[in-house]
Amino acid sequence: MINKGKNTIFTRKKRGIRKEQCTITTHKNLSVKIDYISIVFETATAEDIIMHILDLPTDIFNVYPAMIKFKTYQARWQIGDIYVSVDARKTEDNPQGLGCYLVMTGRGCDDIFRILDSRNYTFGDMFRRCERRYGLDNFHFTRLDIAIDDKNEKSY
């Protein structure tokens, strides 16, 4: 163990691999949160995502014609910074034109976190709903950002 004031560095050996663990602050000075999510659902509708994954009513969303570059979506359901892009064009690979693209920016993640938390749910519960409803082969994450905010007087 190396101790330099309040910063302590521990050296551990585990299964022959040397790992360094550096403790530079305490948990009370850090906050960690999900800051951006994007998920593609291969066989879903906007209504299904909104009602069964986000657990929100569809009538609070505004619907706009919108396109995403390099995607076949033609409409976007939106409330605040939560977006569900839908209405994929029918193609040979997708004859029913199904599929959605769920995006939550930082504020959208904060909003859905508050909603989940008020119902005693977590993001993990929401992700498990995705798995239960669509199976592992019918949805995938395209982006999942984590933000770590350091609230120390002196940042590390």
Task: Name each region found by the language model.
Residues 1-156:
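Structured, helix-rich domain cores that form ligand/interaction pockets
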